Amino acid sequence: MRKIILASGSPRRKELLELASVPFEIIVSEVEETIGAYSSPSDIVMSLALQKASAVAEYNSDHIVLGADTIVTYESRILGKPSNEAEAKEMLQLLSGKTHEVYTGVAIIAKDKTVTFYERTEVTFWELTEEEIDAYIALKEPLDKAGSYGIQGKGSIFVQHIQGDYYSVVGLPISRLVRELKQFNIDVTHA
């Protein structure tokens, strides 16, 4: 059986694959995450996911390679990972009391087939006080996450409502991924 390789160092993506009993290895893609001129957030995440998977698949062509990327958008503004605490605070203030979208794109590459897809989830935040934001940033949790929060961590206390796939917001739409893997003769639903 061909190995599945996760082209990501994300501990959250690793945990989600383990949760679904997907057997895999990790080879971190060294692709620089730069957002070029794309027409939509879905194009951005699918393109970045494909770039990451392609970089690893180039040297692992006998296996199935998964790449993924997540971004947060608010009113056409893309919120990636903050570069510092001040930017994290600005993002959280922007999202406070509002609904934003989280896009996660996935690419699955094998020698004979490539599949890309994305999931879009709406997340609504409660109104956040400056004290709440400052305390959260002090934890350092938001500094490596798109939109400056982790819904699976302490950032969960900011979420008033979610519409869509929770796991996509975490970083990998695992339910859809498991279904897409069936196209590659990988079925973990009976494992």
Swiss-Prot record:
Its main location: cytoplasm. The keyword Lipoprotein does not apply. It is an enzyme of class 3 (hydrolase). The keyword Hydrolase applies. Its EC number is 3.6.1.9. GO terms for cellular component: cytoplasm. GO terms for biological process: nucleotide metabolic process. Its cofactor is a divalent metal cation. InterPro entries: ITPase-like_fam, Maf-like. Keywords: Cytoplasm, Hydrolase, Nucleotide metabolism. It is found in: Cytoplasm. It holds the Pfam family Maf. It comes from the Bacteria. The active site is at D69 (proton acceptor). GO terms for molecular function: dTTP diphosphatase activity; UTP diphosphatase activity. It catalyses: dTTP + H2O = dTMP + diphosphate + H(+); UTP + H2O = UMP + diphosphate + H(+). Nucleoside triphosphate pyrophosphatase that hydrolyzes dTTP and UTP. May have a dual role in cell division arrest and in preventing the incorporation of modified nucleotides into cellular nucleic acids. NCBIfam families: maf. HAMAP family: Maf. This is dTTP/UTP pyrophosphatase. The gene is maf.
